[in-house]
Every structure is written in C-alpha cells, then in structure tokens.
Amino acid sequence: MAQIKITLSKSPIGRKPEQRKTVAALGLGKLNSSVVKEDNAAIRGMVNAVSHLVTVEDVK
C-alpha cells in the first residue's frame, strides 16, 4: 500500500480543540515534525480536517 509523509507546517495553537486532537492523533507534536503513514481513507480524512496546518507528500 502507498504511504504519505505528513509534516506539521503551522502551529495548532489557537485552533479548535478538535483540530489540535487530530494533529496529536496523527503523531505530530512540534513544528516541522513529520510522520509516514499508510495512505488510506481514515488518514486522508484526518489530513483533510487539518489541511491548513500540514503538508503532504507521497513516499515512494
């Protein structure tokens, strides 16, 4: 299955609690931290909810 790299590019400080929890659930803590996750519908939905805070790249 394909994988995606998710990087926290903007701070969740001052955002809604749901968005902060989503960032934490993705495994992102500090600014510019990155995680590699499987590309599935659940992860894509979480990324879509905080798309203004993260950047996404395909991993080959």
UniProtKB/Swiss-Prot annotation:
SUPFAM superfamilies: Ribosomal protein L30p/L7e. Pfam families: Ribosomal_L30. The keyword Ribonucleoprotein applies. Keywords: Ribonucleoprotein, Ribosomal protein. InterPro entries: Ribo_uL30_ferredoxin-like_sf, Ribosomal_uL30_bac-type, Ribosomal_uL30_CS, Ribosomal_uL30_ferredoxin-like. One of its GO terms (biological process) is translation. One of its GO terms (cellular component) is cytosolic large ribosomal subunit. PROSITE patterns: RIBOSOMAL_L30. The keyword Ribosomal protein applies. Gene3D superfamilies: Ribosomal protein L30, ferredoxin-like fold domain. GO terms for molecular function: structural constituent of ribosome. It comes from the Bacteria. NCBIfam families: rpmD_bact. PANTHER family: LARGE RIBOSOMAL SUBUNIT PROTEIN UL30M, MITOCHONDRIAL RIBOSOMAL PROTEIN L30. Belongs to the universal ribosomal protein uL30 family. Part of the 50S ribosomal subunit. This is Large ribosomal subunit protein uL30.
